Amino acid sequence: MIKTTLLFFATALCEIIGCFLPWLWLKRNASIWLLLPAGISLALFVWLLTLHPAASGRVYAAYGGVYVCTALIWLRVVDGVKLTLYDWTGALIALCGMLIIVAGWGRT
Protein backbone atom coordinates (compact mmCIF):
# COMPACT_ATOMS: atom_id res chain seq x y z
CA MET A 1 0.00 0.00 0.00
CA ILE A 2 2.85 2.42 0.81
CA LYS A 3 4.60 1.71 -2.50
CA THR A 4 1.35 2.35 -4.39
CA THR A 5 0.72 5.59 -2.50
CA LEU A 6 4.25 6.86 -3.16
CA LEU A 7 3.89 5.94 -6.83
CA PHE A 8 0.63 7.91 -6.94
CA PHE A 9 2.33 10.96 -5.39
CA ALA A 10 5.17 10.78 -7.95
CA THR A 11 2.57 10.46 -10.70
CA ALA A 12 0.64 13.47 -9.42
CA LEU A 13 3.78 15.57 -9.19
CA CYS A 14 4.62 14.78 -12.82
CA GLU A 15 1.12 15.75 -13.91
CA ILE A 16 1.12 18.99 -11.94
CA ILE A 17 4.55 20.01 -13.24
CA GLY A 18 3.50 19.07 -16.77
CA CYS A 19 0.49 21.37 -16.49
CA PHE A 20 2.12 24.14 -14.44
CA LEU A 21 4.92 24.84 -16.92
CA PRO A 22 2.56 25.62 -19.86
CA TRP A 23 0.48 27.68 -17.42
CA LEU A 24 3.58 29.75 -16.67
CA TRP A 25 4.18 30.20 -20.38
CA LEU A 26 0.60 31.27 -21.09
CA LYS A 27 -0.22 33.31 -17.98
CA ARG A 28 3.13 34.73 -16.98
CA ASN A 29 4.86 35.07 -20.37
CA ALA A 30 7.56 32.58 -19.40
CA SER A 31 9.78 31.00 -22.03
CA ILE A 32 8.17 28.76 -24.63
CA TRP A 33 11.01 26.35 -23.88
CA LEU A 34 9.11 25.36 -20.74
CA LEU A 35 6.88 23.31 -23.02
CA LEU A 36 9.72 20.82 -23.56
CA PRO A 37 10.09 19.75 -19.91
CA ALA A 38 6.31 19.95 -19.60
CA GLY A 39 5.92 17.38 -22.37
CA ILE A 40 8.52 15.13 -20.79
CA SER A 41 6.81 15.43 -17.42
CA LEU A 42 3.41 14.54 -18.90
CA ALA A 43 4.89 11.56 -20.76
CA LEU A 44 6.42 10.37 -17.48
CA PHE A 45 3.03 10.88 -15.81
CA VAL A 46 1.34 8.59 -18.34
CA TRP A 47 4.06 5.96 -18.01
CA LEU A 48 3.82 5.99 -14.20
CA LEU A 49 0.08 5.35 -14.43
CA THR A 50 0.82 2.12 -16.30
CA LEU A 51 2.87 0.73 -13.40
CA HIS A 52 -0.14 0.09 -11.18
CA PRO A 53 -1.46 -3.51 -10.98
CA ALA A 54 -5.15 -2.75 -11.51
CA ALA A 55 -7.61 -1.91 -14.26
CA SER A 56 -7.06 1.57 -15.69
CA GLY A 57 -10.36 3.02 -14.46
CA ARG A 58 -9.69 1.83 -10.92
CA VAL A 59 -6.19 3.31 -11.05
CA TYR A 60 -7.55 6.66 -12.28
CA ALA A 61 -10.23 6.70 -9.56
CA ALA A 62 -7.76 5.97 -6.77
CA TYR A 63 -5.18 8.35 -8.24
CA GLY A 64 -7.68 11.20 -8.01
CA GLY A 65 -7.53 11.16 -4.23
CA VAL A 66 -3.77 11.46 -4.16
CA TYR A 67 -3.87 14.15 -6.86
CA VAL A 68 -6.11 16.29 -4.64
CA CYS A 69 -3.63 16.01 -1.76
CA THR A 70 -0.62 16.70 -3.98
CA ALA A 71 -2.32 19.73 -5.55
CA LEU A 72 -3.01 21.14 -2.08
CA ILE A 73 0.63 20.63 -1.10
CA TRP A 74 1.56 22.46 -4.32
CA LEU A 75 -0.90 25.23 -3.40
CA ARG A 76 0.87 25.70 -0.08
CA VAL A 77 4.50 25.25 -1.15
CA VAL A 78 4.58 26.76 -4.65
CA ASP A 79 1.69 29.22 -4.60
CA GLY A 80 2.22 30.17 -0.95
CA VAL A 81 -1.47 29.92 -0.05
CA LYS A 82 -2.35 28.90 3.50
CA LEU A 83 -4.57 25.82 3.56
CA THR A 84 -7.97 26.09 5.21
CA LEU A 85 -9.88 23.60 7.32
CA TYR A 86 -11.93 22.87 4.19
CA ASP A 87 -8.77 22.06 2.24
CA TRP A 88 -7.55 19.67 4.95
CA THR A 89 -10.95 18.04 5.32
CA GLY A 90 -11.36 17.56 1.58
CA ALA A 91 -7.87 16.10 1.29
CA LEU A 92 -8.54 13.66 4.12
CA ILE A 93 -11.79 12.49 2.54
CA ALA A 94 -10.14 12.12 -0.89
CA LEU A 95 -7.22 10.18 0.58
CA CYS A 96 -9.59 7.87 2.48
CA GLY A 97 -11.40 7.18 -0.79
CA MET A 98 -8.12 6.30 -2.47
CA LEU A 99 -7.16 3.94 0.36
CA ILE A 100 -10.52 2.16 0.19
CA ILE A 101 -10.22 1.66 -3.58
CA VAL A 102 -6.62 0.43 -3.38
CA ALA A 103 -7.43 -1.92 -0.48
CA GLY A 104 -9.95 -3.65 -2.73
CA TRP A 105 -7.58 -4.20 -5.68
CA GLY A 106 -6.64 -7.72 -4.72
CA ARG A 107 -10.14 -8.74 -3.68
CA THR A 108 -11.92 -8.60 -7.04
Curated annotation (Swiss-Prot):
Its main location: membrane. One of its GO terms (cellular component) is plasma membrane. Residues 27-30, 82-84 are cytoplasmic. It holds the Pfam family UPF0060. It comes from the Bacteria. The chain crosses the membrane at residues 6-26, 31-51, 61-81, 85-105. Signal peptide: none annotated. It is a multi-pass membrane protein. Residues 1-5, 52-60, 106-108 are periplasmic. It is found in: Cell inner membrane. Keywords: Cell inner membrane, Cell membrane, Membrane, Transmembrane, Transmembrane helix. Coiled coil: none annotated. Belongs to the UPF0060 family. HAMAP family: UPF0060 (MF_00010). PANTHER family: UPF0060 MEMBRANE PROTEIN YNFA. This is UPF0060 membrane protein YnfA.
